[in-house]
């Protein structure tokens, strides 16, 4: 969706011109992160969202964020984080993307600390870590039981500071309609004001889509029903390549509340929670029996399949 000489290289923005206009659709964690990085590198940012950032799905994330910080003296490393991630993805993940993510993760956690995220700490200045699925060592940084909310609060404040200096322009309560195409080049997008129903055309050098999950595709979801997937559908209709649909995540542990599923955080199993089913009148701890090495902390796809069985 790039119509200019803008790219991301080695985790940093590289822009030929510092006057590029970047349109970002979505104002959750991904959208706000992109807005911050673009603004800090001299770009003009137009941030579009149908809801305020305070209602983004990212606010609901509870468990934590993974990074091989090795504050528990377990000889953890980004390389081991990479190996665990590729294994959990059954070899399907793009190794270049996974390598970049795992190498950057420790630096990104420290960046979030500088933004003001109040991660739990062990000792004076070490980030506390907990267990999560698919990993043999503790590498999940967390902020009490509302990690997503804490990160989003810090991100929202940081973006508002950019707004105050005119570096970011917000278009809250605006929905994405379609891209503006100049031949086969993306040169902006069309949005609609949800209050006035007025259509607005936004010209830009690049469009970043960060609209979250496609919860409207599924009968049962723990995600917000406002994340319908309609933006992804419109891009697909326009011929934008859609990849990695098989990576849509199925969270194994939920509670049914009326017509909605509420998530039980993986942190519950990371802190010792055990999964069982009744068999012959007794509690059968099936994950521990079938997967003795990691037990209840097997990757989510495996755990979800075992529960379904």
Which residues fall in each region the model found?
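Core beta-strand elements of the Rossmann-like FAD/NAD(P) dinucleotide-binding domain
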Residues: 19-20, 197-206
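Glycine-rich FAD pyrophosphate-binding loop
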Residues: 40-62
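An anion/pyrophosphate-binding glycine-rich loop and adjacent beta-alpha core
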Residues: 234, 240-309
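Conserved redox-cofactor binding core of oxidoreductases
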Residues: 113-198, 210, 254-256
């Amino acid at each position: 969706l790039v119509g200019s000489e803008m790219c991301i290289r080695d985790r940093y923005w590289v822009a030929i011109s510092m006057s590029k206009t970047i349109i970002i659709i979505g104002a959750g964690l991904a959208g706000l992160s992109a807005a911050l990085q673009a603004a800090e590198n001299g770009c003009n940012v137009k941030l579009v969202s149908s809801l305020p950032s305070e209602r983004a799905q990212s606010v609901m994330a509870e468990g934590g964020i993974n990074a091989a910080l090795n504050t528990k003296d377990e000889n953890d490393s980004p390389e081991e984080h990479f190996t665990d991630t590729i294994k959990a993805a059954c070899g399907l993940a793009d190794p270049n993307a996974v390598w970049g993510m795992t190498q950057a993760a420790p630096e990104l956690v420290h960046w979030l600390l500088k933004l003001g995220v109040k991660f739990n700490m062990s000792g004076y200045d070490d980030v506390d870590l907990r267990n999560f699925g698919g990993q043999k060592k503790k590498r999940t940084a967390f902020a009490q039981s509302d990690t997503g909310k804490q990160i989003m609060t810090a991100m929202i404040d940081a973006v508002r500071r950019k707004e105050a200096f005119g570096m970011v322009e917000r278009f809250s309560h605006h929905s994405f309609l379609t891209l503006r195409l100049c031949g086969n080049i993306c040169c902006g997008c069309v949005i609609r004001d949800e209050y006035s129903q007025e259509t607005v055309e936004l010209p830009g050098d690049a469009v970043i889509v960060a609209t979250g999950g496609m919860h409207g595709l599924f009968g049962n979801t723990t995600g917000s029903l406002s994340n319908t997937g309609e933006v992804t559908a419109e891009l697909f209709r326009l011929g934008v390549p859609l990849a990695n649909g098989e990576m849509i995540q199925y969270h194994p542990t939920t509670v049914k509340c009326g017509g909605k599923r509420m998530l039980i955080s993986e942190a519950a199993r990371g802190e010792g929670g055990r999964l069982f089913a009744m068999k012959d009148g007794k509690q059968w701890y099936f994950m521990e029996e079938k997967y003795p090495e990691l037990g209840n902390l097997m990757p989510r796809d495996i755990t979800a399949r075992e529960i379904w069985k």
